[in-house]
């Protein structure tokens, strides 16, 4: 019986060899432990801003409220910012700033009170800003949400 054998090209054999050597190293960097909090390992910590003027802070928060990356969160936060940002105290601005450092989907689920998907952490349970956002998200005026014009800030 005639057996046909195929030999891999040298480049592919070298890649396969490299892959066999690297895979154990790569796997060692990832945890299969379900208790391991992957988010805390990959989360980028916010820049601490020192001596930022209140006007500059408001301008930055407007931008961060509008440019989240997830449309649902963009609409909620930008509308909320247009309505409330001008009247917030410096302490409320700091709290809102800290909230914007959370993950987008977490903010969305907390604001829409979807606690089963993403429970509110202790640090946000008594937050006045989160309560205002939740009240805003109920849309009691039954308006269609859209990105507010920049003049509304």
Curated annotation (Swiss-Prot):
Main location (coarse class): mitochondrion
GO BP terms, alphabetized: mitochondrial electron transport, succinate to ubiquinone; mitochondrial respiratory chain complex II assembly; protein-FAD linkage; tricarboxylic acid cycle
InterPro entries listed in its UniProt record: SDH, SDH_sf, SDHAF2
Described purpose of this protein according to its UniProt entry: Plays an essential role in the assembly of succinate dehydrogenase (SDH), an enzyme complex (also referred to as respiratory complex II) that is a component of both the tricarboxylic acid (TCA) cycle and the mitochondrial electron transport chain, and which couples the oxidation of succinate to fumarate with the reduction of ubiquinone (coenzyme Q) to ubiquinol. Required for flavinylation (covalent attachment of FAD) of the flavoprotein subunit of the SDH catalytic dimer.
Miscellaneous comment: This protein may be expected to contain an N-terminal transit peptide but none has been predicted.
Gene3D superfamilies, sorted: Flavinator of succinate dehydrogenase
Keyword Protein biosynthesis appears in the UniProt entry: no
PANTHER family cross-referenced by the UniProt entry: PROTEIN EMI5 HOMOLOG, MITOCHONDRIAL (PTHR12469), SUCCINATE DEHYDROGENASE ASSEMBLY FACTOR 2, MITOCHONDRIAL (PTHR12469:SF2)
Tagged with keyword Mitochondrion: yes
Signal peptide: none
Family under the similarity heading: Belongs to the SDHAF2 family.
Quaternary structure and partners: Interacts with the flavoprotein subunit within the SDH catalytic dimer.
Protein keywords: Chaperone, Mitochondrion
Protein name, UniProt field: Succinate dehydrogenase assembly factor 2, mitochondrial
Domain of life: Eukaryota
Localization (cell): Mitochondrion matrix
Pfam families assigned: Sdh5
A cellular component annotation (GO) from this entry: mitochondrial matrix
């Amino acid at each position: 019986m005639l057996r046909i054998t195929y030999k891999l090209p040298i480049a592919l054999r070298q890649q396969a060899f490299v892959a066999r050597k690297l895979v154990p190293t790569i796997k060692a960097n990832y945890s299969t432990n379900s208790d391991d909090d992957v988010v805390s390992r990959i989360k980028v910590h916010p820049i601490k801003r020192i001596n930022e003027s209140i006007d500059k802070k408001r301008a930055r928060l407007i931008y961060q409220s509008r440019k989240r990356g997830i449309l649902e969160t963009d609409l909620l936060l930008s509308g909320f910012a247009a309505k409330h940002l001008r009247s917030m105290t410096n302490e409320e601005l700091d709290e809102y700033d800290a909230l914007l450092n959370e993950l987008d989907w977490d903010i969305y689920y907390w604001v829409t009170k979807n606690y089963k998907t993403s429970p509110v952490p202790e640090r946000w349970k008594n937050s006045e800003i989160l309560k205002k956002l939740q009240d805003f998200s109920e849309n009691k005026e039954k308006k269609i949400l859209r990105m507010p014009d920049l003049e509304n800030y």
